[in-house]
């Protein structure tokens, strides 16, 4: 009789096995609308849960500090080659443990403490690692931030240029965590060249769309590109550094190891290789196109129901609901949808009067439920469920109806039907 990994876990540690089982059930029973989350394939899960977790492999393929890396080298080289092919890059480093680690390695390569960086303000849709004062990027470097136009809630490249000319940053950062519109990398490169700055594109949210040719490509215009490998790319949680400059790539490699990390997580790198291989298949482009269409369907229905969206819509996988028009906070909206088994997150909106712990926005995304097979009709229904819940916050009857409709959708599109952990759910 063949024993599975879950059998070993159940026998060894039923408490952890039970909690994993509960998390699996939660993922199955909820509409996952967090824009930065997705469901990776069973093949990626298998790679991450393999014996590769046992192996130390400091260094790069063919140049390790440990013996016994002959198979690890082949796996990591496949991941590198697939990443380069997927994004059209001259160089790829697949070792960063996260997007934040990837960004830090770029800073270590291009900057010295005290240099100036320029990125989008976190409250307008930027990221912690783009100069937030609570992050090392905001502690080690001088920081100036740009935002979106108050009128359009979109990037104003003339304003960004004026700020860059005034501040003269050494590094200009584009790419965001909560910006629903297309980014013009060519315009950013023009601004960077005019002030003598390096240009970094952090495409963590849109990497899958870029790889599918459904968002402009940053590689021809940016000195360095970083991304996570989950989100729209649908791989394991991790980071990736790309560049069109092979010589710069060598410096970036040294900033990853030994500059900022030790041994790479080769089981995760194997998962990245599998995910990159999946993304190179024609079906992935169809998936990415559906992600965009589903986001538009959700956005359109929310607007049809009278809810305000930041920038009045979306070009990618995410949208921000501005709840000020219905006199509600993001914290309250997050709680309301959570009560009917919809997972989202409160988020600041541009020029938000609320604190980051309260916010005036709700961020929604389409990647995860698109992975489960849902299309525009289902996302239109999701829009109606969200609107019904937010516009009737005190109605238990509406809440119960919304919860029933969520369950019906989840039942129609099962998640990981092959996965079972045969232990009772813990009390």
From Swiss-Prot:
Top-level lineage group: Bacteria
Main location: cytoplasm
InterPro entries named in the record: PyrdxlP-dep_Trfase (IPR015424), PyrdxlP-dep_Trfase_major (IPR015421), PyrdxlP-dep_Trfase_small (IPR015422), Ser_HO-MeTrfase (IPR001085), Ser_HO-MeTrfase-like (IPR049943), Ser_HO-MeTrfase_PLP_BS (IPR019798), SHMT-like_dom (IPR039429)
Pfam families according to UniProt: SHMT
UniProt keyword Cytoplasm, yes or no: yes
CDD domains: SHMT
Modified residues (N6-(pyridoxal phosphate)lysine): 231
Catalytically driven reaction(s): (6R)-5,10-methylene-5,6,7,8-tetrahydrofolate + glycine + H2O = (6S)-5,6,7,8-tetrahydrofolate + L-serine
PANTHER family: SERINE HYDROXYMETHYLTRANSFERASE, SERINE HYDROXYMETHYLTRANSFERASE 1
Role of this protein: Catalyzes the reversible interconversion of serine and glycine with tetrahydrofolate (THF) serving as the one-carbon carrier. This reaction serves as the major source of one-carbon groups required for the biosynthesis of purines, thymidylate, methionine, and other important biomolecules. Also exhibits THF-independent aldolase activity toward beta-hydroxyamino acids, producing glycine and aldehydes, via a retro-aldol mechanism.
Protein name: Serine hydroxymethyltransferase
Naturally occurring in which organism (per UniProt): Trichormus variabilis (strain ATCC 29413 / PCC 7937)
UniProt gene name: glyA
